[in-house]
Amino acid sequence: MKHLLIIFSVLLTSISWSKDVDWKDLIKRDGLWYEKFTNEPFTGNSTGLKQGKVKDGKKDGEWLYYSVNGQLYLKNTYKEGKKDGERLKYYDNGQLMEKGNYKDGKRNGLKTDWHKNGRKESEGNWKNDKQEGLLTAWYENGQKRTEINYKNGKKEELQTRWYENGQKRSEVNYKNGKQDGLVTEWHKNGQKSFEGNWVDGKVDGVVTFWDKEGEVTKTDTYKDGKLVEGIKL
């Protein structure tokens, strides 16, 4: 009798998991997935353009998402309804667009993005859904575009940007997510275009502007973010 009960239980589980329902016939209520016109959290397989398992109303395991033309554009992994594991996103030509990881519903670890031509677009680390450490971005031609440091999701220390031709575009210092310290910008030809100082997110002191030939065109003086004096040369 005991063996019969075990077999019966296994059969019930197998039957419930084998139930296939088109994703359009699943609805979400209070964080759980239900088959339309039912009151029991769904357990089974979602089919069609959104394919994956649902257990007790929660997504579980690998899910595949397709466009209307049948092109795979997203892979997500779930555990008890939360993203947990690798995430892959694709362009319509099949080229990988994004690769990252989640843990307990939050983005964690290395995240990499690619341009449609296959060249890397950006790369940086995440911790508990916040950017952490160095984020680097590139133009489609492979030239470095930006380097930004993050701490607990906020910009910290030096941020550097470049033009597409490789010439440095700007250097900005941050502290706890706010501009703090020297800010310098350059024209595309390499001549300095701007320089000023920030304190706790506000411009403070003398700021200077240059034209593309290297001549000073204007100087302004600020105090606590407010213009005190401006001189146009």
Regions found by a protein language model. Give the residues of each.
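Sec-dependent N-terminal signal peptides
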Residues: 4-13
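Glycine/tyrosine- and acidic-biased, solvent-exposed loop/turn segments at the edges of beta-strands
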Residues: 13-233
